Each structure stands twice: as C-alpha cells, then as structure tokens.
Amino acid sequence: MTQDPRFPNLFILNHPLIQHKLTHMRDKDTSTRTFRELLREITLLMGYEITRNLPLTTRHIETPMGPMDAPVIAGRKLAVVPVLRAGVGMSDGLLELIPSARVGHIGVYRDEQHRPVEYLVRLPDLEERTFILCDPMVATGHSAVHAVDVMKQRGVPDEHILFLALVAAPEGVEVFQQAHPGVKLYVASLDSHLNEHAYIIPGLGDAGDRLFGTKN
C-alpha cells in the first residue's frame, strides 16, 4: 500500500495481483464476462487489504483441545454499499470475503454537466456500523462525494466510512478530499488526468457499460 503526498487520505493498493488483474481490466479487448470476473476478483483482494485494521475483540470458545479466548471482529457487522450501477459489480467480491455483511445501495448518475443526480437510497441500520462504499471510478469525484454525503447526513461518522474504487483521477481525488478530508479513499490506481469528456486517462473506459455489456 502506497500514498501520494498530495492526498493524505488516499491509499493506493499496489499488491502485484491487484495490479495484474487491473491491467487485464483496462485492455479494450477484454470480454464482458472476463471483465465481470476480474472485477469480482480484484475487489476481493482489495477488500482484504482495506479490512486489515478492523478492531478485534475476543470471544470464549471451545476447541477440540480445550477452551480459549479467540480473536473476532469487534462491533456490529460491516455493511457494503455499492454506488449504482457499476458499484454492484464490486459487491460480489466484498460479500465473498465478508459473507455476513449487510448490503445497502445508493443510486447516483451523472447529468450532462457531470453533476450527481440521486435516484435511490436503501441502507441497513446505521448505528455503530462500518460502511464500505464502492464504485469502480472516481473521475470528477462528485458522485463519490455525494455518496459520502448521504451517509454523513444520516449520522455516520468519517471513521466508519471507507470508500473503495479501482481507478481515480487526481482531479476527482482533490474534490473528494476537500469535501471529506476525514474519509479514507482506497484505489488500485491513481491515473493521469481527466479528458475533456471527464473520462479518466488512461482509465478503463465506462465501467458500467463494460460490466453489463451496454452501450453509452
């Protein structure tokens, strides 16, 4: 895991398997089926990385050889909240890693001016729960900011929110960290820049279209 000195709460997950799979996802010749499988696999690996500092407590159990106080994750069950629609493709990998997690959804799309438009919010009980928000791309950053706004407006503190993305542009990370400096953002890659159409360069194209086999 590395950091960029410009962005104190951005964490780049540079594990070799993550980077290898991301390269195949970027390839324009990768099929929809393979893209979908890779997204699940890479999200599982990223989920392993971002949960390494979850707090632990102990629970008394009996092993076949006798009693012990064994480590378990402290607090209430985690929640996975994909940002629709492309974030749905990331939830499978996280739920494979954390099958007991609760699931919410935040529906946001970008209008012609690249502003976020909310159309759905469905969340589990919020109290004392850690939330992993996921969206493959942080381009302009506005959708990510809006998704975190949704959580914080409902009383979820910064330290209980983790935002997970595959690829981000510096412009979007700047917007995100100005809006939510206390929320940690985890990505597989910090790419070069946004083009005139607000697409990440080099990026991987439209993640939703590639995931679902649709045309923009």
From Swiss-Prot:
Any one Gene Ontology BP term: uracil salvage
Record Pfam families: UPRTase
Reactions the enzyme catalyzes: UMP + diphosphate = 5-phospho-alpha-D-ribose 1-diphosphate + uracil
InterPro entries named in the record: PRibTrfase_dom, PRTase-like, Upp_B, UPRTase/APRTase, Ura_phspho_trans
Protein's pathway: Pyrimidine metabolism; UMP biosynthesis via salvage pathway; UMP from uracil: step 1/1
Activity regulation (UniProt): Allosterically activated by GTP.
Binding site for 5-phospho-alpha-D-ribose 1-diphosphate: 85, 110, 135-143, 206
Cofactor(s) in the UniProt record: Mg(2+)
Described purpose of this protein according to its UniProt entry: Catalyzes the conversion of uracil and 5-phospho-alpha-D-ribose 1-diphosphate (PRPP) to UMP and diphosphate.
The family this protein is said to belong to: Belongs to the UPRTase family.
Protein name: Uracil phosphoribosyltransferase
